[in-house]
Amino acid sequence: MCIRDRLLEHSPFSERDIKTPQYENPVSDGPIEVVVRLAQGLQSYEYRHHPFDIEGWDGCYFPWAFNVNDFMPITGKVHQPPPVHQVFQAPGLVICNFVPRIFDYHPEAVPAPYAHSNVDSDEILYYVSGDFMSRKGVEEGSITFHPSGLPHGPQPGKTEESIGAKEANEIAVMIDTFRPLQMTTYCSDIDDSKYPLSWLDSE
């Protein structure tokens, strides 16, 4: 029997990697607060019982999850373009996964990404775990924001350090948005003012 997926065999994941939730009885104790995100902030509602106290599900949408550790990286002899890391696409954005992988294996390859400017997208990177070979000034749990048109790439010395490296041991999730992102007060409160200075050569 032949089972055909919507994805081709060279895709970095398959439908088997999509996980659906297991049913659990809803919490019956009330009241329950539900917070809804609105365009200008958050709105809080209070219910007498849990909103998931339902009998079934009808419709085309349902909850599911994809674990970043199930992403199978695409590698090449020379540095691959960002779309090889793409896992999802939606109107106005793409999501990419950077996971442990073999580095470029051409004898003269330079594994570090080249400096570039995203002329039509804002870039957010969430650093989950590992050693981020092209970055300094970040650690596990860091989030970087590079607005559209801002040149960025490896900091001084990171390109040279990458030469001869065999593999990447990192997990990071990137979101590129094709509409400008707006900074909130919360983001301003946790901004690391030293991060832009990490591109200055310390020598």
Where are these regions (language model features)?
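Short, small-residue-biased leader/transition segments that mark boundaries at the very start
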Residues: 1-3
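Electropositive nucleic-acid-contacting surfaces
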Residues: 6
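Non-catalytic accessory regions outside enzyme or core folds
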Residues: 10-13
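A short, N-terminal "cap"/entry segment at the start of jelly-roll beta-barrel domains
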Residues: 15-106
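Sequence-level motif detector for i,i+2 pairs with an aromatic at +2
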Residues: 42-44, 122, 168-170
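Glycine- and acidic-residue-biased ligand/ion/polar-headgroup-sensing regions
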Residues: 89-101, 112-143, 147-149
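Short, flexible active-site loops
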Residues: 109
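TerminUS-proximal long segments
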Residues: 135-203
